[in-house]
Each structure stands twice: as structure tokens, then as C-alpha cells.
Amino acid sequence: MKRGKLIVFSGPSGVGKHTILSKIINRKDLNLAYSISMTTRKKREGEVNGVDYYFVNDEEFKKAILNNELIEWAEFVGNKYGTPRTIVEKLRDEGKNVILEIEVVGALKVLDLYKNDDLISIFLLPPSIDELKKRLLKRNTETLETIKKRIQKATHEITIKDYYQYNIINDNPDHAANQLAEIILNEIKQS
């Protein structure tokens, strides 16, 4: 069985990463597995532990770092996010193409760590910073101060888009999802 690819899919908070992935994750031709991240942030309404994230406390997260159990991790606005190593490697060994939906800081670590591996890197961009701000406000899950910090961070993150193999502008979720699927299919066919 051929080992699966590692797909790094990142972009600013609120750009629509989760929405886009939900449109293609179950496509059989892509053979995708979603890498579930570990986080110390509070669970949002409707989120399920072990499905959306592994929600842990700060002590459990620190232990995972010390035991080298995370491929990458980053902290933002007091919350930590990381990718559990054993889950990703197990899925790839099973032939699955594993999608890491991660923050830009963590993504850059993965791009460096796996640069000689079967890696696909895709950066999702908003049509504009104003549109991104509207999306974050529409979520209605964070304070205005947190949204301001996310916009500042996004402005910086967008400058890093050229570190990725592919860029997709999310001006329409269906169109962006189709672009993402096409990129993955083309990369699978080339290997």
C-alpha cells in the first residue's frame, strides 16, 4: 500500500478553512483523512471533542509538548493548538491523504519538517481584509479586541502565502472547494 500524502491547508482565522474542507472531506477519489488538532481553547457551541478538536487543559498540552507528541504547535490569544504526531503517521501508513488544517505558524514548522516528504501545501486567502473582518464578526464568538488581533495577525499571515505551493482565494466556498479538490487530485496523479 502506498503511503498517503500530507496536505497542509492553512490561512488566516475566519477565512473559511473548515467550511471548504467540509465540502470535500468525504470524496472517495481524494482518500482524505482529517487530522484533528489538539487545543486548549474553550469548545464552541456545536463542537465535539475528538471530532472537531481534542480539547485539553494547559497541563495536558504541556505534557504532549515535552513528550514530543506534536508535529507542530502554536499559541494565539492565550490558546494553544497542535497536531498529534501518532495519529497523522498512522493514517498516512494506512494510505490516507492527511489534511492538516492548521494556523500559519504551525504550518511553517510542518513545511520545514516535511519538506522532503510527500507534502502538498495550500494557503486559503480571503477576497479582502474587509471581507475577513465581516466573517469574523458574523461568527459572533469572540470579543472585538480578539477580532482586532486576528485581523492584525491575518494581515501579516497573508504576506507568507508564497511559502506554499498553491494559493486559493475563497470568494465563493463551492468554487474554492472545487479548486482544492482539483489540486489534491492532480498531486495524487503525479505521484
UniProtKB/Swiss-Prot annotation:
It catalyses: GMP + ATP = GDP + ADP. Pfam families: Guanylate_kin. InterPro entries: GK/Ca_channel_bsu, Guanylate_kin-like_dom, Guanylate_kinase, Guanylate_kinase_CS, P-loop_NTPase. CDD domains: GMPK. GO terms for molecular function: ATP binding; guanylate kinase activity. The keyword Nuclease does not apply. Gene3D superfamilies: Guanylate Kinase phosphate binding domain, P-loop containing nucleotide triphosphate hydrolases. ATP binds at residues 11-18. It is an enzyme of class 2 (transferase). Belongs to the guanylate kinase family. This is Guanylate kinase. It comes from Ureaplasma parvum serovar 3 (strain ATCC 700970). The lineage of its organism: Bacteria, Bacillati, Mycoplasmatota, Mycoplasmoidales, Mycoplasmoidaceae.
